[in-house]
Amino acid sequence: MRKIKEISADTMTPISVYLRLKGKNKVILESIPRENDQSRFSIIALNPVKHIKFTDGILSVNDEIISDENPMEFLEKLVCQPESTDENLDLPFTSGAIGYAGFDTYGIFEGIQPELKDSIGTPDMYFMLYESALIFDHKREKLIFIEDNTYSQRSEKELQNALSANIESLSLLTEAENELTELSKLNFVSNMSQELFEEKVAKAKELIRNGDMFQVVLSQRLTADFTDNPFNYYRKLRVENPSSYMYFMEFDNFHVIGSSPERLVAVHGNQVSTNPIAGTRKRGQTEFEDQALIEDLESDPKEVAEHKMLVDLGRNDIGKISKYGSIEVPVFMKVEKYRYVMHITSEVTGELRPEFTAMDALRATLPAGTLSGAPKHRAYQRIYEFETQKRGIYGGAIGYLTKNGNCDFAIAIRTMVLKDKKAHVQAGAGIVYDSVPEHEYQETLNKAQGLLKVGQ
């Protein structure tokens, strides 16, 4: 059963609605234009009915341990309802799971579990199951309120009461809407020195030259004290560094804030797609400088070879679950500009085979080659030898799985994790045989700038 109410939203924004809503574990997912295109939907969800966590091999639902279950298969069985249909609803999400599967999830499934310190302390996988959602349709300037009982079996009266409460909350102006205070200066400290990072790059290059692998992504983590309002940080981030995937997620004891430019995988019906991004330059100060940097990027043999290799890896990942002959690359090596950097981007698509699902697509693509390397399995093993801490959420997948089996996941890059009054930002660089260590170190900092400079 579902209750839906649509109202005019021409005087509202996702931010004002989010601030007025009363509820727990609120999340907001937005897609902000990269250049001049118009993004259609923003998603807000609140009051999840279940918390699904997977930590160090232990699966739990609302903190009750579930034995002998593969967490992704369990999530799919819990969320997806084959008999459900969203006919006549041109909406990306009505109910389902929102959350993340971290980088280390792959290692758990593949038996690669080194004894590395987890210095942040977040679950390897954490999804919240939502029946209460609000969808902004920016094209039609409408706000759609949705209350569903797929997972909780709430009565019709309970659904109507919840719907009415959310609508009524929008009539109350909050002080927070007009009080966007200045952020404190964040003094980030890396988990390794520049010298140490460059030593690791040199060692990785030696392995590559010896034929151990073709590419590996090495990263550094930057940490700072954080005492500001997390949502104020998101409000500034979305203005100062807009991107394809914007998200603010309020978990039980931590927050995840991000502005990721890169799709890991999306499934809509039987169509599956991934969006490799590799090849980076900082933005120029002028249009002339920008164009010169674009030409330099497009003619750099190292960047071009790396990108082509990762497109091939994306084709291979999507090919595992797609019909033979259906793989296409509709976008190949297009340069896209962001606030602080520009990237070479491509898109790989396929037609999902009938025996596979959205979670199979996630398993096939996680982690992205752009965050691990090639061959993926070997590069993943080497990452754990080079890096001294579990990556956690960084490099994993952030997004949603709907009850009708669709999904959309971004790669967890340009992402900040806030926990225990600490802000954690991680960024990496793809190392190949002709990488220059100091250039790769600088690339990690360039990629992190969109988060490090917010409000500064």
Swiss-Prot record:
Residues at which chorismate binds: 279-280, 394, 414, 428-430
Regulation: Feedback inhibited by tryptophan.
Keywords per UniProt: Amino-acid biosynthesis, Aromatic amino acid biosynthesis, Lyase, Magnesium, Metal-binding, Tryptophan biosynthesis
GO biological process, one term: L-tryptophan biosynthetic process
The keyword Lyase appears for this protein: yes
InterPro entries in the record: ADC_synthase (IPR005801), Anth_synth_I-like (IPR019999), Anth_synth_I_N (IPR006805), Anth_synth_I_PabB (IPR005256), Chorismate_C (IPR015890)
GO terms, molecular function: anthranilate synthase activity; metal ion binding
Record note on quaternary structure: Heterotetramer consisting of two non-identical subunits: a beta subunit (TrpG) and a large alpha subunit (TrpE).
Protein family (similarity comment): Belongs to the anthranilate synthase component I family.
NCBIfam families: trpE_most
UniProt-recorded name of the protein: Anthranilate synthase component 1
Name of the coding gene: trpE
